Amino acid sequence: DLLIPGELGEGLSTEAAALFGTLTKTEPAALASLDTSLTTQQWQRDVTAIRDRMFRCRTAHAEPLELLTESGSPVAQALVGFVLQATARRTPVLVDGCLATVCGLVAEKIAPGTRAWLYSSQLSPEPAHIQAVQKLELTPLLAFDLTTGQGTGGVLALSALNAAIELVSDEVYAITEAINAQNDDT
């Protein structure tokens, strides 16, 4: 079994950046999108939105459950619960996108050891995503710079994983057959 959470909605990368910033005490400007198509005013609005969300949660940075409550994000709350339940069941989770990865980090703060069950499907250019992957010490399977979330990178990574498993299975079968043939000759 392998679970791939995805998120869908507006403002989720801002929510992820605010959660990450509050949890790690990272400045909002270091978490705002680096998209070169943004104007200075758009980038400033992004920083302001992250800052305002972080301010709302400012007293909760040391307590991850309180941080989730203060954030008011049902999507983040659901994703953290999803990751925690998967970990309790010892089921690997292929996190994809900024919010899912940040929620994996929040889950790690709630239940240390969670990271052992987390795998990163891909790395987006979002600063909060990059930093969350680093904090979790994950190695992304793909580097597509996808910003869509929604599990898209997870599905693509799953295809790559299935192909790798097939290749390894074929190699193991061939080696086993060769060993068996050699044993039959002796």
For the regions a protein language model found, what residue spans apply to each?
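N-terminal loops that bind phosphate or other acidic moieties
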Residues: 1-186
